Structure formats: structure tokens, C-alpha cells
């Protein structure tokens, strides 16, 4: 899954290791969901999904590359720092994208916020008292 390793490097090389695992998990879990392409390469390079992938490839140290590979391996064996069903994230260093309003925030690791589909238990309804 070298495309996922590149994604972790481009999207989260400056983040804590646990956030790198969560970023890798997003890509790997999308492969299993019919809403996204069914290969890691297809997910990682899908248009308008991961802004870091549209950026020019930066230079990374051997240690950064090995750490990213370990993060991808950790996600492959099932480690999910934010739980299952996390398909979106963004860096909190930018303004929250509009798509976050329709999702449920599950966790924040480093400066990355991770989101899942809203579940019925996430919705709070307020009924007027008559």
C-alpha cells in the first residue's frame, strides 16, 4: 500500500503517530465502502479528497518513511484510534469544511479532526412544550 504510505506522509507527517494511523485507517476503510473506489490507489488519488495528495511530493527522511509504513501496517492489522467507520478528516489548522456539518466528530488527534457518518444517537431533537 505505497499510495497509502505516501498519503500518510503528505497529509500527516508532522502529526503524532496515532494520528498517522488514523489517517491510514481512513484510506483503508474507504476501500471497503461502496461510496469510494475499491483500491487503495483509487481512494488516495480520487479527485478532491485529500488536499495533500494534490501537493508536490516533499522530501522525507528515512525515519519519516518508516514511521508512515508502520502507521499503515498498524491500520492494516485493525488498529482504529478513533473507532470504526471514520471516513473523513481535516486539519484543524484550516477553517472547518462545510461537509463537517453533516457528519459526527469522533476524535481529534494532533491537529487532525476525524469524522464519521451521523448515527441516530448523534441527533438531538428538541420538542416544544405546549
Residue ranges and their predicted role:
Residues 1-130:
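Bacterial extracytoplasmic/cell-wall-associated proteins, especially those involved in peptidoglycan
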Amino acid at each position: 500500500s505505497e499510495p497509502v504510505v505516501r498519503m500518510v506522509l503528505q497529509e500527516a507527517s508532522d502529526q503524532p503517530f496515532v494520528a498517522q494511523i488514523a489517517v491510514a485507517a481512513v484510506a483503508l476503510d474507504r476501500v471497503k465502502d461502496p461510496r469510494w473506489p475499491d483500491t487503495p490507489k483509487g481512494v488516495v488519488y480520487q479527485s478532491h479528497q485529500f488536499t495533500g495528495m494534490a501537493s508536490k511530493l516533499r522530501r522525507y527522511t528515512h525515519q519519516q518513511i518508516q514511521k508512515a509504513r508502520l502507521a499503515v501496517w498498524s491500520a492494516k492489522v485493525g488498529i482504529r484510534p478513533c473507532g470504526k467507520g471514520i471516513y473523513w478528516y481535516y486539519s484543524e489548522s484550516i477553517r472547518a469544511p462545510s461537509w463537517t456539518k453533516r457528519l459526527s466528530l469522533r476524535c481529534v488527534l494532533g491537529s487532525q479532526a476525524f469524522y464519521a457518518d451521523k448515527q441516530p444517537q448523534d441527533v438531538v431533537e428538541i420538542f416544544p412544550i405546549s
